Regions:
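A helix-coil-helix interface module used to build multimeric assemblies
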Residues: 4-193
């Protein structure tokens, strides 16, 4: 079998990223490797800021006005940044360590932060970062993609239920005819269940 296939929609590991990409594209910003990197950067930076706010004695001198600049690192995280993280990872052979080094490079770019760089990832394991990133990915994808789409389905069902509330239909119980109902009432049951 061919070992080094170029990645595209036909060679993706799953049809979710191939055949069904048009249906799942909105989820890429939450579940792609790029997204995981962005969430990891966010967790690392917010943790660093939290250490500054404690204040951890060694970080008392960190200029708090730079917090927004630090947050811009994940807010503006790009595919180019993700590619750079992959380059770092090719040397470190460790995905979370590559994120740490990436953030240290950003500290260098800001300038004057050398004394604080060793507190990036301070007291953490990779799983601390992952076990925070993954729930955030799930929570935000549900809130920003899934629930709004589900609400559209519920709204459409409720609209049909209202429109069809006067249309009579025979109900059944245990496969036998029962008291009459309305099509609208029965459709509203499905909206309620969702």
């Amino acid at each position: 079998p061919k070992q080094n296939m170029e990645l595209d929609i036909l060679t993706a590991v799953s049809p979710i990223d191939g055949r069904y990409r048009s249906k799942t594209a909105a989820l890429a910003q939450y579940y792609s490797e790029y997204a995981l990197m962005k969430y990891r950067v966010r967790v690392e930076i917010e943790y660093f800021i939290a250490l500054c706010e404690l204040p951890l004695p060694q970080l008392e001198a960190f200029p708090h006005h730079l917090f927004d600049t630090l947050r811009d690192v994940y807010r503006n995280f790009s595919e180019k940044d993700a590619s750079h993280v992959k380059e770092i990872e090719s040397v470190t052979n460790h995905d979370v360590k590559a994120i740490e080094y990436f953030i240290k490079e950003k500290f260098d770019a800001i300038g004057g932060l050398d004394n604080f760089k060793e507190f990036i990832h301070f007291g953490l394991t990779s799983q601390d970062i992952n076990n925070t990133s993954f729930p955030m990915m799930l929570k935000e994808s549900l809130a920003e993609v899934y629930v709004p789409l589900l609400q559209r389905v519920i709204d459409a069902l409720n609209a049909r239920a209202e429109e069809w509330k006067e249309i009579p239909m025979l109900a059944k119980t245990h496969g036998q005819p029962a008291s009459p109902t309305s099509l609208g009432k029965e459709v509203r049951v499905f909206a309620y269940r969702l």
